Amino acid sequence: MELVDEVEEDDILMNLIDKEVHQWICPGKVWLDTEGKRIQAHGGSIFYEKDLFYWYGENKEKTAPGNGIIQWGVRYYSSRDLYHWKDEGLLIPPDVENEKSLLHPSSKVERPHIVYNKLTRKYVCWMKVICDKEQLAIILVADQFTGPYMIVKSGFKPL
């Protein structure tokens, strides 16, 4: 009987936590940003620069069953402690005007990667994209991590 009571108390506590910004990491629960919104950085990575961590990934905020929107660009967050994440907006926005673009919301952008190239002094982003059942790649560059990113090569087959 005591075990059941403990589980019920834990369930009540977790329901309360879900309605607020978490004060600790809760495995298996939705991770929220500093505004209490669900973090949209699917298939993401973390980049560290100038005392800031950046968490970036696929933005699925507009994705819903049957609406044809697979992603809505790449969203990023900043943090000084790897726990409190501030939404910084879209790092790489979708190209909603051009249906043929690999960045169109109907394309499946997967696992963006960003590195800093010391030789060119550019930030380089590459992503695999599935478009019309074909795997392609896209490369973008920027002068600073926060963008703007410009496409330098797209539509080629990844290794």
Describe each PLM feature range:
Residues 1-159:
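Carbohydrate-active catalytic/glycan-binding domains of CAZyme proteins
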